[in-house]
Amino acid sequence: MKNKNILEFLKKRGYIYQGSNFDLIEKELIKGTSFYIGFDPTADSLHVGHFLTMMAVKHLQKAGNNPVIVVGGGTGSVGDPSGRSEIRKILDRKTIDYNCECLKKQMSKFISFEGKNKAVMVNNADWLLKINWIEFLREFGVCFSVNKMLAAEAFKVRFEQESGLSFLEFNYMLMQAYDFYYLNQNYNVNIQLGGSDQWSNILAGVDLIRRKSSKEAFALTLNLLTKHDGTKMGKTATGAIWLDKNKTSPYEFYQYWLNIDDQDVERFLLLLTELDDKTISDLCKEKGKKIVEAKKVLASELTKMIHGQEELDKAIEQSKAAFENASDNLPTYELKASDLNNDYSIANILVVTKLSPSKAESRRLITSNAVSVNETKITDVNTKLEDLKIDQTNFTLHKGKKNHIKVIINK
């Protein structure tokens, strides 16, 4: 893709939301430039929503541009209020450092850190934690208008709510703007890439660079990963869909993509895979069985990309086993009897095995005839293991048509 119009490609595939000057951004990306994208270490793994961004970075790098990945060890101590209705939980230093290391390891699977336009990964704690507060206020505080900051959507929404906006969070925009300025000065970065909810923060950095160094820098934002109805992608009843196999197993990951809405398949193939446009169009031009095949291609491409061919093969075999009710090959959930706290109800077992987020949801699943143990449909919310004529230490638990696990209880 080198020397091609990568910006037009990204627009066509559905990545781009907004840009501060598309004509100049296009010229910069065609000739090859340095850009940065930031990730705050609020968890020890990326989730599906992050993967859209990682794919955009991957395309930009393949087109000859240099990615600078900023892990927010410093900004993560404050928390971004964008898209939040309440203050984020403040993480301690040890947790932030651990999360940063996990993210570094995970990103290296998708972005090249070798070669002519290799990616560089930096931690903004390396410069933010060294800042003298008084000196920062004197040199950079004068560059920011409180009026303009309060007009930003992220601040405006919080400011009008009862929970309000903490002074800690109010500083986030200044810190992110300073990141852009620092990277512009030290890494020659002149484009910041971010989600559509980061527009105000990125523009603050563009303005700071112009004020302090009279250089031109640019903002480029991406669409958030959403379903066709506009709701956020990457969440299930039991939580987020993580890229770390210890948080979301390859089997669960594979199943998640098999079960997406038909209307989302083509868009996700365009955004999350490297398949060419014609292949994707051919896969999605017909409905019915054809769209089911397209979902299998999507699930296979993403599972292989994230977890590798071996884990994909296992996920496919487990899916076949579940469909054929061959429990020997199902994913196994092993627990101790003590994990159940003397509550052997099916409702509680659903929660402990993470098939349900709560007993209330378990009861709802049972009353809607979505739960079975081995071949027995569970219809009473009070049903316990002892009520069933089964081996109470080794059985198959089913939720709906797609979620099946083998449960082993060690006494």
From Swiss-Prot:
InterPro entries found in the cross-reference section: aa-tRNA-synth_I_CS (IPR001412), aa-tRNA-synth_Ic (IPR002305), Rossmann-like_a/b/a_fold (IPR014729), S4_RNA-bd_sf (IPR036986), SYY-like_C (IPR054608), Tyr-tRNA-ligase (IPR002307), Tyr-tRNA-ligase_bac-type (IPR024088), Tyr-tRNA-ligase_bac_1 (IPR024107)
Residue ranges annotated as motif 'KMSKS' region: 232-236
Residue numbers covered by motif 'HIGH' region: 41-50
Principal cellular location given in the protein's record: cytoplasm
Subcellular localization, as worded in the UniProt entry: Cytoplasm
Binding-site positions, L-tyrosine: Y36, Y172, Q176
Pfam families per record: SYY_C-terminal (PF22421), tRNA-synt_1b (PF00579)
GO terms under cellular component: cytosol
GO molecular function: ATP binding; RNA binding; tyrosine-tRNA ligase activity
E.C. designation(s): 6.1.1.1
Chain sites annotated for binding ATP: K235
Superkingdom field: Bacteria
Cited function: Catalyzes the attachment of tyrosine to tRNA(Tyr) in a two-step reaction: tyrosine is first activated by ATP to form Tyr-AMP and then transferred to the acceptor end of tRNA(Tyr).
Oligomeric form and interacting partners: Homodimer.
Family affiliation: Belongs to the class-I aminoacyl-tRNA synthetase family. TyrS type 1 subfamily.
PANTHER family, per the entry: TYROSINE--TRNA LIGASE, MITOCHONDRIAL, TYROSYL-TRNA SYNTHETASE
Protein name as annotated: Tyrosine--tRNA ligase
This protein's encoding gene: tyrS
